[in-house]
């Protein structure tokens, strides 16, 4: 099943039901839908394993950049301790446009004209799209148990002004909408430590110079130090490539 229905950040439906039905029948799934993976990550992986199927979700984070297929095998034997990421191409594009003097509304209009932003861009601008991606990453790489949107401290970019963005550039850095998480502390009462918020970062930070709709993520590990992945974070062709890559992977392993 190639599942790419519209993301529902509250329930994951209808995609969640489609994925459950396919996996329950032993059918592998490739999806670009963030909602079901973020909200029911462990349930769906267990369902896939129980029925001899595979669940692939490369296209849920960083569009066509091969993040999970590269970092997953690449970190075998290492512990990922934390990550920081710019995970929303729409927001990064708008911040870059505001840096050159565009108003917030003008930057949004341009992003919509270019096809980067939806007609109803609230999930992007309010940080919920990034929060879902951070949840997927935390469960994939940091050993998080099931998490909900209520576990994420979220602040979007609606409060940003061109003045704040340009001031950051004058200070030698940049403002970015940063998703971050740390490996959870031990103990049953340990609260997930995931946040999404605009932050000032210095020019030497790997995410400071991301252009346009680019996305990037910096993993900190116990053995290899910092490892950075960057690539296009928005676009239909890029997401379609991620789905195709997953389908080819599933097909190859099914032979």
What is each residue range found by the language model?
Residues 2-3, 30-32, 55-59, 82-85, ...:
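General beta-strand structural signal in soluble alpha/beta enzymes
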Residues 6-8, 35, 88, 199-201:
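Short glycine-rich anion-binding loops that position phosphate/pyrophosphate groups of nucleotides
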Residues 14-17, 39, 62, 66, ...:
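Conserved active-site and cofactor/substrate-binding residues in soluble primary-metabolism enzymes
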Residues 49-119, 124-129, 136:
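Rossmann-like NAD(P)H-binding beta-loop-alpha module
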Residues 204-255:
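ATP-dependent carboxylate/acyl-activation modules
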